[in-house]
């Protein structure tokens, strides 16, 4: 038993000697912060507070400039304290609206139907009808 442990110890001591310095990359072992050479030293990130606004994609807007942040269709204005976005009171969508467009700041109803269509036949609202189900056996 002691012989197996001794062989394992020798094996562990021999393996590090087999690894060449070329096999070890500097990326494998990060250096201390003081030893690291940053490739981003030449990048300057400006502070835009009081000078403009930055959107999610990093685009910079001037003070007073109107823009649409992110996926919003509602406009914002770049102010000293950051973007000022007014959310208007949008009209309610009609309950029978079947086609809604989201092109502007508020959703708009483009089509209202007073009937229900099922398999090419029109029915009145709240009109009951039977659905025939045909079962196919193969």
Swiss-Prot record:
InterPro entries: VWC2/VWC2L. It holds the Pfam family VWC2L_1st. Keywords: Developmental protein, Secreted, Signal, Synapse. One of its GO terms (biological process) is negative regulation of BMP signaling pathway. It comes from the Eukaryota. Coiled coil: none annotated. Residues 51-110 form the VWFC domain. GO terms for cellular component: AMPA glutamate receptor complex; extracellular space; synapse. It is found in: Secreted; Synapse. The keyword Transit peptide does not apply. Its main location: secreted. Residues 1-21 form the signal peptide. Peripherally associated with AMPAR complex. AMPAR complex consists of an inner core made of 4 pore-forming GluA/GRIA proteins (GRIA1, GRIA2, GRIA3 and GRIA4) and 4 major auxiliary subunits arranged in a twofold symmetry. One of the two pairs of distinct binding sites is occupied either by CNIH2, CNIH3 or CACNG2, CACNG3. The other harbors CACNG2, CACNG3, CACNG4, CACNG8 or GSG1L. This inner core of AMPAR complex is complemented by outer core constituents binding directly to the GluA/GRIA proteins at sites distinct from the interaction sites of the inner core constituents. May play a role in neurogenesis. May play a role in bone differentiation and matrix mineralization. This is von Willebrand factor C domain-containing protein 2-like. It comes from Macaca fascicularis.
């Amino acid at each position: 038993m002691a012989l197996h442990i001794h062989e394992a110890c020798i094996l562990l001591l021999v393996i590090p000697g087999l690894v060449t310095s070329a096999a070890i990359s500097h990326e494998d072992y990060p250096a201390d912060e003081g030893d690291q050479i940053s490739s981003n030293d030449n990048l300057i990130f400006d502070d835009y507070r009081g000078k403009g606004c930055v959107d999610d994609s990093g685009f910079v807007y001037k003070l007073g400039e109107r823009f649409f942040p992110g996926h919003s269709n509602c406009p914002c204005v770049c102010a000293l304290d950051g973007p000022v976005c007014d959310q208007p009171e949008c009209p309610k969508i009609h309950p029978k609206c079947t086609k809604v467009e989201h092109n502007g700041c508020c959703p708009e109803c483009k089509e209202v139907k007073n009937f229900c269509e099922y398999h090419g036949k029109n029915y009145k609202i709240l009109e009951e009808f039977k659905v025939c189900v045909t079962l196919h056996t193969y």
